[in-house]
From Swiss-Prot:
GO terms for cellular component: chloroplast. Keywords: Chloroplast, mRNA processing, Plastid, RNA-binding, tRNA processing. The lineage of its organism: Eukaryota, Viridiplantae, Streptophyta, Embryophyta, Tracheophyta. GO terms for biological process: mRNA processing; tRNA processing. GO terms for molecular function: RNA binding. Belongs to the intron maturase 2 family. MatK subfamily. This is Maturase K. It is found in: Plastid, Chloroplast. Usually encoded in the trnK tRNA gene intron. Probably assists in splicing its own and other chloroplast group II introns. It comes from Saxifraga oppositifolia (Purple mountain saxifrage). Its main location: plastid. InterPro entries: Maturase_MatK, Maturase_MatK_N. It comes from the Eukaryota.
Length: 352
């Protein structure tokens, strides 16, 4: 990993995240094959013990250097063996190597974002949007509506490439990714998975590549929620340090509303609802909020327009179901959650 960091620590005018040259290094495929380095990835590399070797990697690299093996003619497509090995094994090795390479700048990007947060200051109660238990432990009495959102899916494989293009400036790697996607053509089945489909697809080959692409796609999809949840988190906390932190936070939010109302009047309504909760589970996400029905509808169409215009992801308003917590319950982690109302009895007495 130290060698990878030295590779990316270049001058600013040279730092373009060129990943394609790394594909021709043998240690990339050694990392993809090593079970020890992948102990934190809950996916097994099936079939690598009998298919990968240093000699096979050298032959693959030599073949890629001398000629382009990705451009297969009609006569070569009928051949099931190449250099004594199955051609599918080459594509599988390249995809696994690309996944290992793609995770390097993606992880460095997350580390840099964490370092920037530490420079700004510690924030104990602005927790991650993926925190399931704070979401379940929070008090929903002050919430009115819940939006059951199905994660939008890309209408074309090129959308997946465009999601990586925003932080990966290597055209050669993007072309290689396009080839791998069209080679297997099972991305659309993975992006909208059911539990049965997901288990059957992940257990097949190239699971590391598709899981990496799915996580990067969802990261782009949740970019708007990262901003909103970091600004308007209202998770329950009891520490005194957090209380002072929340006071300082509401002061900053008040100043932000005043500035935003002057410079950007149309988005003033965006900062009026501090009570927002977001969590993602499998292929859908849940957004709970407090506000009027008109405000919730604005949120709905704002998210749809944001995904379509800025992320080029096709989404329909019907994929966002808005229900009132007082009358409906929402399913999450196999449970149906609802809000129990405590009606107050008012007794009147006539005075003589």
């Amino acid at each position: 990993m130290g060698e990878f960091q030295r590779y990316f620590q270049l001058d600013k005018f040279l730092q373009q995240d060129f990943l394609y040259p790394l594909i021709f290094h043998e240690y990339i495929y050694a990392l993809a094959h090593d079970h020890v380095l992948n102990r934190f990835v809950f996916v097994d590399n099936f079939g690598y013990d009998n298919k990968s070797s240093s000699l096979m990697v050298k032959r693959l690299i030599t073949r890629m250097s001398q000629q382009n093996p990705l451009l297969i003619s009609a006569n070569d497509s009928n051949k099931k063996k190449x250099l004594g090995h199955n051609t599918n094994x080459y594509s599988q090795m390249i995809s696994e190597g690309f996944a290992v390479i793609g995770e390097i700048p993606f992880s460095l990007r997350l580390v840099s974002s964490v370092e920037r947060k530490e420079e700004i200051g510690k924030s104990h109660n602005l927790r991650s949007i993926h925190s399931l238990f704070p979401f379940l432990e929070d008090n929903f009495v002050h919430l009115n509506y819940v939006s059951d959102i199905q994660i939008p899916y890309p209408i074309h494989l090129e959308i997946v490439v465009q999601a990586l293009r925003s932080w990966l400036k290597d055209a050669s790697s993007l072309h290689l990714l396009r080839f791998l996607l069209y080679e297997y053509q099972n991305w659309n089945s993975l992006i909208t998975p059911t539990p049965k489909k997901l288990s059957s697809i992940v257990s097949k080959r190239n699971q590391r590549l598709f899981l990496f692409l799915y996580n990067s796609y969802v990261c782009e999809y949740e970019s708007i929620f990262v901003f909103l949840c970091n600004q308007f988190s209202h998770l329950r906390s009891t520490s005194s340090e957090t209380v002072f932190e929340r006071i300082f936070f509401y002061k900053k939010r008040k100043a932000l509303v005043e500035v935003g109302s002057k410079d950007f009047p149309p988005v003033r309504w965006l900062f009026k609802d501090p009570f927002m909760h977001y969590v993602r589970y499998q292929g859908k996400s849940i957004l709970a909020s407090k506000g009027t029905p008109l405000l919730i509808e604005k949120w709905k169409y704002y998210l749809v327009n944001f995904w379509q215009c800025h992320l080029y992801v096709w989404s329909k308003p019907v994929r966002i179901h808005i229900n009132q917590l007082a009358n409906h319950s929402f399913g999450f982690l196999g449970y149906l959650s609802s809000v129990r109302l405590n009606p107050s009895v008012v007794r009147s007495q006539m005075l003589e």
